[in-house]
Amino acid sequence: MATIALTLFGWCSGCSFRLEKKDFLVVLLLSLLRAVTSFSLLIAYQNIATGVASTIHFMYPLAVSLVMMYFFQEKKSLWVMFAVSMSLLGAALLSSGELEAKNGDTIVGLVAACVSVFSYAGYIVGVRMTRAVRINSTVLTCYVMGLGTVLYFIGALTTSGLQLVADGYTWLIILGLALPATAISNITLVRAIKYAGPTLTSILGAMEPLTAVVIGVFVFKELFTLNSAIGILLILLAVGMVVFRKQKS
């Protein structure tokens, strides 16, 4: 549904969806990385505690920073590495909890969470450092999500099969996940990577667990602990530090 919505938006905006052969191969690889990220996270959440899986996944800013510094000659910065470390610690505090999940395989969960780190880091770097950077953000997001849907469809047919949704309430939930949580977040992610760069985008991505905590407290009446407060403070300091240094430079 998110792909359909973005495609309609692209057509209404006058976007051209034509890709060159070389561009298609790059987009296919990015789609594979994005699909692997989502799939590995699902496996991780099924086998280990959600907080632990999220903490491991949010090591991707560190992976992005290291790749950009050592493979693409991005200027090494102690400020950036310090900010990454602060955001990792903040995410860990926000997601802290038990390791094991009920009826889960801990080893499988840990491996899957680690896979999500590198696949997501590869996707973020790939959007900026390949031919994909020249493709319109809406068009690129449409192709990545569309090809990812095809990959999931094939995977579903070869494993557990597809489950049709019948009731309207579930469709409303799916619609809510498809538009603001998937379509909008993915297209803004691509634009951020192109204009702000992979490293800054990945550090700002640490705001995601912070947002989850805020919604959990004010909407679902979850407890707000000392760990949550410290985690939020560390993430805000990390983001503020990077933005301030970026403006100063």
List each language-model region with its residue ranges.
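Hydrophobic core positions of alpha-helical segments in small-molecule transporters
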Residues: 1, 56, 79-82, 115, ...
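Membrane-embedded alpha-helical segments of multi-pass membrane proteins
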Residues: 1-4, 55-63, 107, 114-119
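Membrane-interface interhelical linkers
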Residues: 3-29, 42, 47, 70-82, ...
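Small-residue-rich packing faces within the transmembrane alpha-helices of Major Facilitator Superfamily
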Residues: 3-7, 62, 88, 146-150, ...
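Hydrophobic transmembrane alpha-helices of multi-pass small-molecule transport proteins
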Residues: 6, 28, 67, 76-98, ...
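Hydrophobic alpha-helical transmembrane segments of multi-pass membrane transport proteins
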Residues: 9, 28-46, 92-93, 111-126, ...
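C-terminal transmembrane-helix exit sites in multi-pass transporters
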Residues: 9-14, 41, 60-85, 210-229
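Cytoplasm-facing, short amphipathic helices at loop-to-helix transitions on the intracellular side
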Residues: 52-53, 137, 198-201
